[in-house]
């Protein structure tokens, strides 16, 4: 095995002739001290044999993962038998001895003998099975060989079941660990044969399933056992000094090679998950022994006894923290020199810098040890080359027998090869002067031998050099080499006929928020972790095959939270789905916490050098997501057809109950039925035409059942606001008509659009845009009539939302149940790689590859709160108590958006009977119903009183009951006061959506109509245009500097200077009487004057002084808040024709009013009261602010003699503030 390499502890005699100048006695003693001490060292043969066998077996397994060819399998089993039961010394005993030496613990004699005897029996049985398998593979039709194989298989598998506990004896677990791992590997490979050949050599389908389930179970158990006892043994060796670190590192390396590497391959034996050839990769690092003199008689001559650093210091210096897999590109070595005499000197490795690069990533440079030396550094370049072997010489510079020696490395040969170009190979050397009694050769192949000696080592090497640390002390300069397995290739090459596993640490860069964490032991390397949304880093791949080949993505993960996993290729998202957590927060990373999942939607690569990106979104809370690897899985036409048919059959069958295949499940939504129909429609006519027809009939029947149970009218949105012919629309029955109309389809605001089915919806859906004013929301509603409802029953509203923001959903009966939903969506379900997601006739091509949403999660947001839903489904329940056809309370279904950013696209709406109410739910709805009726009785008494007061106030405004003439003394304040009383009538409209009339709508609109008439008549009497300055200075003539300012939400004219003047010419009727009324406020000294006059004479004026006591105008004066917004940009002719232009529009039955109602709901809980709706009051004068304190109102009577008068406003000094100017025609 090692005949072509020098022994690890070979001593190179490097003594020069000048050594004779020194005293012979000291020299003799020194040279004697350099003799190898055999007592306390690992047996070289045992160590090399153990490592060689572990590397050989792992290397061969990597070549037969998935479903190997029959010839491969026969050859592989022959190889295993030869490796584990060779002629000569027992390999299993070598395993035991090696671990015993590493941990310095002897296994008991009884346990040893029992284990070895059982292993010998297993070897004999396995060899017989292997020979029978070969015989059968050569002639599978031979009944005799098939029968023999069947019998031997069952017996051998049972032998392994009985034997495994003998390799896990209590308190002997660690020394037996390598034996256990190799035996477990054989057992799992044997179990795999049941899936590979079981049906052919006589196993029943039930037996095959049982063996498969045992394989899955034992894979988990064996993996966790090996990792647990590996960690136990390793931790037991953790010490405080350098000597303990040497053993610790040897255990870590050798049991990684002999135990953990096998464990990492166990999952790939699953032929159902990996039905074709599979490429796995090991990215873990192992560390060869430090390059320092060891095994020397004199203790100080061993580097780890020569005042070496502590255990923790060595570990920190030699072992990198978890990182992305990278490749060594350049090494620069810095040297130092020490001299005792001309014959005793050494120049040695003191420090270095390393340049390395992850696959497709940037160059990283790190510095180790001391680099501030005066000796010229040596630079070695290894770009695209693997250093597969190092031959390092550990030197000891002796300073006499009474002084501590210096340990250093004066010479290293780095043997390299280019894996892409085998002729590019050679040696890079670091060589420095050395004169001292001896050197020790440290050959890396002694610790990491090639996989075979049948080929040159530059072809069969097992590991490549990846990194170098250095242990540094004043007299210790010891490099430590780090190695990665050769299976981790440089290019992430993807083959068209194999499943390619790519560990996530092969990403080209590490995004912010992603960390590399130490692997749990069974993953074959480190893994990536995220605790928030974001990417895991791009993986650059090389496609070795036609770009037309389609692939799927699989991945292995563990998570403490639910999350959405996205996969993109070259910037285009090709897969996404929501995955559930696999573990609880704080749990240890065990094998069972990792699960393997695969997307079903295939994709193609667009270029030979491409990039795969993965990311997570929508974490269900604070937690951790770990990703081990992704898998690139080739897709074949037969696989797709069979998979699609199986998935469609399962989906169709899942629509119906288990007890009655003609009865639809309650939780099957209308949207889900549409998606199942798409699944069936996309089945291949070529492979499964008959099955497709049968499934289509079933899914059509399911759709009919869904339509029959849906209580909504027109759920497919054929129209909105369609007037039924039989509905009355005359004024006397207007509110009854609204209720009747709402029970016959959808009603909504004009900005809602109905759109035909797309890649999300199979049928019509609606789009609700945002609004610029929350008092004029976008809305959609329908009423479920009382006749459709059953007493004491729970009903459910549900549907599908493609995307939404600020979408409010209400169910209203006794009170409102309410949700506000933000559902993130995408622009399209189709990846950019799909050039034409449109069918031949323009319809969406729902069979094209598309993003995979998860529509099957229920909406979980309750309590009226606004939240983001990662489910596109929503549902909302409401309970119905006693039904009354005369009262026809029904259930109102309302969708509303009241923000500018809001929007929604939704469809497949359903209102279905969920279940009868029983127990506590029944009691709750009865209590809610009683509260509602008690509240209604109180409301009726209150309404009667308020209506009487309001009607008296309204009637007092007019001359008689014809409501066509105002009383002579009616002013705007009186109108506002009456309007306030009218608005005290509650439940005129539903507070959730004021377009829907409430129980008091008729009486409210009756009185409100009279208020509107009063305002109109009052406007007609005032001939001053823009007298309240709500339109600024429009219609006024201005001289000097004046301004209109907002004060207390009112518009005031401010005249700050005595030379300024504001005037307006007003048309009047000669001979008629007018009242000039001014409300104003004077600041400072002087007077404010408002003058009215004709051309030559007939002048009168009102004067205002600071702090004068006058009759204050009623504080209810004001105007419509909406007046400025509606008329502010109008010209003089339009804006000033009427003081309250636009008032009637503001007071009509506004079908777009909004709501400020957000009750809190638990499941089955109802509120006792409804809040007032602030938008309802914004529609009129009721919120117009009163005149602030300090303003006074003065008036005078004026009788013009011509048809034009002038009103002029000015002051003598100080500041004059005018709130309003009115010129009112006197009533006769």
Swiss-Prot record:
Cysteine pairs bridged by disulfides in the record: none
Lineage: superkingdom: Bacteria
A molecular function (GO) term: signaling receptor binding
One of the protein's GO biological processes: symbiont-mediated killing of host cell
Cross-referenced Gene3D superfamilies: Galactose-binding domain-like, Pesticidal crystal protein, central domain, Pesticidal crystal protein, N-terminal domain
Matching InterPro entries: Cry1Ac-like_dom-VII, Cry_V, Galactose-bd-like_sf, Pest_crys, Pest_crys_Cry1Aa_dom-IV, Pest_crys_dom-III, Pest_crys_dom_I, Pest_crys_N_sf
RNA-binding keyword on record: no
Pfam family, one: Endotoxin_N
The entry's keywords: Sporulation, Toxin, Virulence
Annotated spans, Disordered: 423-458
Summary of the function given for this chain in its UniProt record: Promotes colloidosmotic lysis by binding to the midgut epithelial cells of insects.
Family: Belongs to the delta endotoxin family.
Note: Toxic segment of the protein is located in the N-terminus.
PANTHER family hit by this protein: ENDOTOXIN_N DOMAIN-CONTAINING PROTEIN-RELATED, PESTICIDAL CRYSTAL PROTEIN N-TERMINAL DOMAIN-CONTAINING PROTEIN
Protein name: Pesticidal crystal protein Cry1Ba
Originating organism: Bacillus thuringiensis subsp. entomocidus
Gene designation: cry1Ba
